[in-house]
Each structure stands twice: as C-alpha cells, then as structure tokens.
C-alpha cells in the first residue's frame, strides 16, 4: 500500500475515451498466470494485485481502474469529457456524488512545432519575428500574418498540398495493388488527387474511428452530398484516414460505411479512404488540405 501511494502521488492519469473498447480488461486468471512470479518478488499476494484492477460487480482486471488507483490526479480531455468520465467511473467512488468525483479536465490542443511544416515555420519566422512559436496564444503575435503577401502565403499552401497529394497517390496506389485492382480503376480513383494541378478543394477527416467522432455524419444526407461533390465546375475531394480499436465493432462499421459510400459510382474518386494512418501521414494531411472537417 505504501508503494502504491508513493507512486500515485506523483502520477497523473488522463483518460481519452468514453468508448468501452478503449478500456482494456483481462481475466483474473491471466493476470495470476503472468504476474505470479512478480508478486512473489514484491512480497504481495495475488489478491492484493487483483484488487487494484477490480470494479464493483466485475470479475476481470480493469486497466482503467488500476490507473485510477495508481494516480492522484485524473482528467478527461475536455470539460464535457471530464464530466462524462466522472459518471462512467463513478462506481470506483460509490460514496461520492458524480459531480464531486475527482476527475477534472484539460483541453486538448495541438503541439504546433510537431504539426506545422518547415515551410510555414520559415515564413512565420520572417513575418512574425523570432520566438513567435512561444507566443502562439498571444493575439498580438498574429497581427503580422496580415503582412504576408498573398502570393507567398498561397504558394506555400499549394506546395504543401501538392506534396500531400503525392503521398496520397502513393498510398492509394499501394492499397489498390494489394487489392488487385485494375490500372483503369486506379486512374479513376486518383483523377482529382493531382499534385500537378492542386486546385481541387480538398477536405480532410483523420482521427480514430470512434462513434462519438461522427465520421459518418457527412453521409446522413446523400442527396445533399451529391450536390456538393457532383458539380463539375467546383470539384471537391474528401480524404478520410484513421483506425478503429480492434475491439470497437461500431468504429469498424464506420470505416465500412465510408468505403461503401466511396464506392458508389457518383462518388468514385471524390471520397478516398487512405489506409495505414500514422503520425507522418497526419502531419501531411494537416499541412496540405484546404479544410479540416471536424464533426
């Protein structure tokens, strides 16, 4: 108990999702089997270890319960999510009202230096002055943005968009080959993703395919979507990327829905789902798309 407390007072636990599939749990028998030797070395019983991961009425070892008991500061990733998490985890503090549960929140943000491209960094260094990246929350820091000549601003954006489209074409070509698709079909899929003519309005949606992120909201009204995507005078390209947790069946169903709509003849080449989502691809998408879709 003293060792757990010593660790807990220096530990912060951030819970990221309300989706049950994102909270791992394992059979107590598995925990006993793999941790029996460690328990003997530490001088604790199997029961003491298992108690750290139990939830009331449960018979499995819950990793979220372990993290809660092994920390003294707990937070969600937005004000609403903090409240939702407090209610979800309320069984761990049955003696405390939900509104008083020790789960607070932080507001998720973006680490600018990680996701901003080197091209934008160089441009901002010239026009916003040295040290701007340390003052991104200071409104006055961004007054210099209006002094950037339009042609320079647009040139950087179009260059990054072309780089992104090169990567999109490469990845779509690879996944098309894995699926034994024809060259003619590939040409139709990539007709709008043209890095030599990056003037098609390109909209990106890339994140985990969890139901509450509403990846399928765009497809609730297909007639409205047709009006947007089937105007030859104003071509639009939607790029989807992301992964679902292996145990999240509804999340996987969302991916299948995106593929289903993308395969409709009228949407061919106008909605692309790019496989193999990772941080490298995320950076390219953030830098290259015209609009970031957030449902």
Language-model segments: residues:
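Catalytic cores of carbohydrate-active enzymes across secretory and cytosolic contexts
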Residues: 1-295
């Amino acid at each position: 108990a003293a060792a757990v407390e010593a660790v807990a007072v220096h530990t912060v636990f951030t819970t990221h999702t309300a989706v049950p599939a994102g909270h791992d749990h394992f059979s107590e028998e598995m925990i006993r089997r793999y941790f029996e030797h460690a328990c003997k070395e530490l001088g604790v019983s199997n029961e003491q270890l298992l108690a750290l991961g139990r939830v009331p009425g449960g018979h499995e070892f819950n990793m979220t319960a372990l993290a809660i008991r092994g920390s003294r500061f707990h937070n969600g990733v937005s004000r609403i999510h903090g409240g939702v998490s407090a209610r979800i985890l309320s069984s761990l503090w049955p003696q405390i009202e939900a509104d008083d549960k020790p789960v607070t929140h932080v507001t998720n943000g973006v680490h600018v230096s990680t996701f901003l491209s080197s091209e934008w960094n160089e441009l901002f260094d010239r026009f916003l002055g040295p040290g701007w990246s340390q003052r991104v929350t200071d409104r006055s820091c961004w007054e210099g943005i209006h002094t950037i000549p339009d042609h320079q601003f647009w040139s950087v954006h179009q260059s990054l968009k072309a780089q992104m489209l090169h990567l999109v074409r490469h990845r779509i070509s690879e996944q098309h080959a894995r699926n034994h698709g024809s060259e003619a079909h590939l040409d139709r899929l990539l007709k709008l993703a043209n890095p030599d003519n990056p003037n098609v309005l390109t909209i990106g949606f890339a994140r985990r395919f969890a139901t509450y992120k509403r990846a399928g909201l765009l497809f609730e009204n297909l007639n409205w979507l047709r009006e947007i995507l089937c105007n030859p005078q104003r071509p639009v390209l939607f790029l989807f990327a992301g992964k679902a947790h292996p145990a999240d069946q509804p999340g996987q169903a969302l991916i299948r829905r995106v593929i289903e709509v993308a395969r409709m003849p009228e949407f061919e080449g106008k909605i692309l789902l790019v496989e193999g989502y990772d941080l490298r691809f995320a950076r390219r998408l953030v830098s290259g798309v015209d609009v970031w879709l957030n449902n």
